[in-house]
Amino acid sequence: MTLAVPVVDLGGFLHGGRAGRLAAAQAFGRAMEEAGFATITGHGVAPALVRDTYRCVREFFAQPEQQKRRHTPPEQTKGRGYLPMKIESVAATLDGRTPPDLCEALVFASLQRERRGVGLPNYWPEEPTELAARINAYFDAMLALARHLMQLSALALALPEDWFAPMYREPSLTLRFVNYPDQEEPPEPGQLRYGAHHDYGGLTILRQDEAPGGLQICDAEDVWHDVPPHPDGFVINVGDLMSRWTNGRWRSTLHRVVNPPRELTGSTQRLSMVAFTGPNGATEVACLPTCADAEHPPRFAPVNAQAYVQSKLAASHALAPAR
């Protein structure tokens, strides 16, 4: 059974007039309210860039474990670098008690700050040789797309189109390339490729491939539904900060990545390319003026964007309880 994730064409928003922009915004807003997820097409990201980045990252994950671990930070946190298998459990952010997730990742964060020579540097593998160029180009494409999505969101929420612009001049944007290897051994009871969780930030941009054992979302009746990949689409979903901004109108939907069926033969390897986007870390996230009134007062206390996300990241590594 499949819960339909709406497909929203951004062509009218990016290339149309006022009517086309509003129509796309309204469709996007409905999807965020009803499902918390949408698949976008007509987004303007070059297919060749996606293919080249995917190929390059897959080559990185094909290297021996010892070679990949050269780019693991000593503390093995989720901030940046190579994250080996089984070092996190995202279900812990919801007080879940599940075995570690069956995935490995390569993470890049705060590239804008790194380019200016400030903040922590990322871990840049030497192989493949073109990886740094591909990652930087993909980051720029995701940054541009994130800003378009926030303009779209502002219109959908009856705000001026540039409402979020000050918070997204240098936003929080983390690229996470996730490899779900073939499962040679059966998972432990309750163990998934990626446990059930909500995303923490603003909007998440996901490119997923065709492989068994994929993304599922949970509906209001606690039933799980597959989210099929789109050949040229990105899956967009609402994170906690965006939901708090909208007073819960936009849903931060529970989701997970399931294991492939054990009876399958052949490779079930899966690679996902994720851009976690959100406002600048100094932003105070409080209810938007168009999302509350006398009958619908603010449901959430204001939070600092960076502090909120960091508490969730720490919990996923069992470093501290989530707030």
Segments and roles (model prediction):
Residues M1-R323:
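Peripheral, non-catalytic segments flanking oxidoreductase cores
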